[in-house]
Amino acid sequence: MASYKNIFKITHNDVLPIQGSILIAEPFLQDAYFQRSVVLLIEHTEHGSMGFVLNKKTDLIVNSFFKEFAEFPEIPIYLGGPVSPNRLFFIHSLGDNIIPDALKINDYLYFDGDFNALKRYILNGHPIDGKVKFFLGYSGWTEGQLNHEIKRNSWAVSHITTDNILSADGEGYWKDSVELLGNDYKTWTKYPKDPYLN
């Protein structure tokens, strides 16, 4: 009889993580924060890594924390990761001309910046749906930790980012990201979350 490991053998690529990469959780990862998650790396150096889970929306909204936004359409908050879970972060495509002091992640994404400038932008009536994404907490790895997890096959790395990163949510986005890895990975989307329950 085929062993469990052979039945659910996972193929991984050899793509190395860099700033702006996305990490796609392998299908059996059981961690509450990272199960079927897609993580955007906003920093990756020899000293450690930082990123945000893109597809885990919470029941919280930004409007509840800032009375100025009480009458605005609801602005969702996502679960960025287990580190600093009470701190609010944001990524955006507005650029550092609109949001000073924003850190450039790649050609079209930025991290944080002057929050007062962002508030003014919203209060002036500019829509932010699909342009700004808020998180509570972030995902962090110490020196060498992420590379170890990748070698252990917890993550597949991709430099392909979709144009809906700022509005992505749910397991459907994980499946879409897996399919962008190529045909070798399509079986990932067919696996049960827990193979022992299949």
From Swiss-Prot:
InterPro entries: AlgH-like. Gene3D superfamilies: VC0467-like. Coiled coil: none annotated. One of its GO terms (cellular component) is cytosol. It comes from the Bacteria. HAMAP family: UPF0301. Belongs to the UPF0301 (AlgH) family. This is UPF0301 protein BDI_1431.
